[in-house]
Amino acid sequence: MVYWFDSHPIYYWIIAWISFGLLGCAALLPVAVGLFSEKIEQRMLHFLPRWLFMALAALCLFAFRWPTWYVPKEFNPDESEFLAEALTLQHRPVFWGAVDGESHGPLDVFPLCLLRGVGLKYDFFGERLFGAILMLALIFGCYRALAAYARESVARAAVLPIMCMLVFCSFWDFVSYSSEDVPIASLAIGFWLLVSDLARPLARRRWSARWIAGGLLLGAVPMAKLQGGPASAALLVTCAVCDLCHGGIELRIRVHRTLVLAASSLATTVFIVLLTWAFGALRHAWLSYVIQNLNYTQAANSPLYMIQHFWEFVQQAVELSPYLVGVAIVAALSLMIALMAPASNVRLAVLALVFLAASLGVAIAPGRFYPHYLLFLIAPAGVLAGALWVAGWQSAERAPQAPWVRAALLLLLLGALVCPQIVARATHPHPYLGQLRSIESLANDPVTIEIRRYGHPGESLGMWGWMCRYYAYTGMWQATRKAHTYKQITPSPQIDYYRYRYMQDLQRNRPPVFVDAVGPGNFLYNDRAVAHESFPALRDYIATHYRQMADINGCRIYVRLDRLAQP
């Protein structure tokens, strides 16, 4: 059926746009009717409950995104690396002991280990489906954060631009499973939990599961991607300060709540650190996850350079630049009305501004123009525009012609943030629709076929170079802690440490097949001057224990001698 839809794109578009039409009706009809009759608005919300609204959001997201799930090649080399790490953790579930993410942590990878438990394979389909579910969680977090400070119907309209951005997006680095997916979903849900707790009546704030859960989620972000840590820290500190400065609760209770938030935010990190220490991998975690990431940011473009070239950075992601322009327009025009709102109505906008500023810093801090870093901006930018729009909506209640002012605000939201995204999606072809059969042939890679002659799924695979796709294609786990050898090839103060660790892992796991993926046509490494022979200890080990069996597409395939001796 998938191939039938792919070969008949018109039916794909019909179903996708019908699903969006249903979502648009659920988002906009109640607020539009509410301009003139709150009674009818409430009746409509009764027939369009919250769960149905989110179900329509899921239907719409999946209806537009499914062609990307079936593309049997990596959109980003990181996708194959995540699959390789998940396969390895099934064999030995010790992060930094069996797997080293370097720029990402265990919470980015361990959730992928659940794919097999729900009947999915370790492949690009399951990985991207999980990524889409995380985007749905992000949408839910933004929606409920807005609903904590606005009427249900108004919150639905305010979150629609974020939905459009994630539903219509087909940019390769945004629809792939990336190391940002878990952090941005956690940030959005954690943001909702904390700001919704701050919106609760004072009498109900003493004990709150939301406050603790929000701290746990935001505190877990650095264990998914260390880069996201400053954004989670900024939100935790800002929410704690807002709570401490509120004079309506006893100081003792406010201090207690701050301590509870601090403890919950540290709990996940402390737990993972203790586990890592217990398995003897704490030194590796410190060197690779902390020191390496600090060195990574220092050996790149300066923050000033990134700010000066920020718009060029944004324009790499084709759908993001019009979204951010729309956010700026809605935020600026809504602000003029929102300034007349009560302070409580503007609080969400202030918190969202902190969220956006911290996320902007997170996106540019590494000093590299990698588009997937920009994923950090989608939720906070949309929530800031939505929060100011909501505050303007609430301020308009005092206007002599309140329905007409609100109608103008609704038209502003649609004209600046919703309709441009609809037009862009409707007028641009889907890059992966109608091509599945031709793309599928890419998975029948001759290197993969040759590896499978000697190795089998569930066995380890040795690799020199950066062609992690062969782990994903063969179902074999990585024999060394890292799926590629960037750190073993690139000169750095830590190269001896990484090479020593590489040899330890290779000798311990003794992979039946070793692939030297340095050669013409390979990712990043084409010059065989940096092939495995450039590392004398590895050269001697391979020469002693392996025999070269093929040289295909720039990859030399070696097989362990005792495997060749088997009948």
Regions found by a protein language model. Name each.
Residues S103, G229-A233, V237, A426-H430, ...:
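Short periplasmic/luminal acceptor-recognition loop of GT-C membrane glycosyltransferases, typified by
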Residues A150-S153, A188-A213, L244-I249, Y323-R347, ...:
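Membrane-interface transmembrane helices that cradle and orient dolichyl/undecaprenyl
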Residues G24-I40, E319-V346, L353, A357-A358:
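Hydrophobic, aromatic-rich transmembrane alpha-helices
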Residues W207-L226, S232-V237, A267, L356-A365:
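Membrane-interface alpha helices of multi-pass inner-membrane proteins
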Residues P230, L360-V362, P366-W404:
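Hydrophobic/aromatic-rich transmembrane helices and adjacent perimembrane loops
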Residues P106, F110, V118-F140:
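Loop-to-helix entry region of an early transmembrane alpha helix in multi-pass inner-membrane enzymes
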Residues C142-V167, I184-A185, L202-R205, V350:
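Transmembrane-helix signature of polytopic, membrane-embedded enzymes
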Residues A231-L266, M336-A343, V383, W389-A399:
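Perimembrane helix-loop-helix junctions
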